[in-house]
Amino acid sequence: MEAKAVIYAILDFDGEKTARLVRAHLDQGADAREILDQILIAAMDEVGRQFSSDIFFVPEMLMAAEAMQAGLEVLMPYLARSEIRAKGTVVIGTVRGDIHDIGKNLAAMMLECAGYNVIDLGVDVSKGKFLAAAKKHQAHIVALSALLTTTLTEMEAAVSDVRARAGGTLKTLVGGAPVTASFAAEIGADGYSPDAAGAVAIARNLTEAVSK
């Protein structure tokens, strides 16, 4: 049975078929970790590429992530939880004063599907809560989202707080409609992504930097 069949099922948003094919791979002796890394995560990478190319949009990304989740649920009994979350821990939230969560939720889902342990703090999150959660969960990355231009100062304050109190051991990733690459660089963020799909690739780079 080819891995492509599972990937196509995810790209077709067919969770039932995805789960059935993953189960068939396991029955044939396939390694659960390899199914996760080489099939399910590879499928979400392709979803990210199609989103970046304007082939998929937010609804398609959500449906693909749900299909992937159906396959992941089949794998769960075959994988220790620590193995599934081996890529790192990300604390994510929308900064204080901003209650918009669509972009943040999508980024959280994409990161989780890519194998990260995601601690979602929700919206209107103060800089202190970001840092406290990061320390509590021994996070590798703090991801901050903002939709309102008026809350960019809160994002800057939170990034500065992480840099001042956590040093280089904790990376920051920022994004949201009013956020630009130049603004991210200006406030000292370690990573910037213009969309949820790109957040996964940036997170990988940041976690690799931390582990070196």
Per-region residue spans from a language model:
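Long amphipathic alpha-helical segments
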Residues: 1-83
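Ser/Thr-centric signal marking residues that sit
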Residues: 18, 94, 149-151
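Short glycine-enriched loops at secondary-structure junctions
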Residues: 41, 96-98, 178
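Alpha-helix N-cap/loop-to-helix initiation residues
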Residues: 57, 99-100, 151
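Non-catalytic signal-transmission and effector/linker regions of two-component phosphorelay proteins
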Residues: 85-86, 207-212
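Glycine-rich active-site/cofactor-binding loop and its immediate structural neighborhood
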Residues: 85-121
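Cofactor-cradling patches in redox/metallo enzymes
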Residues: 107-114, 119-189, 195-204, 208
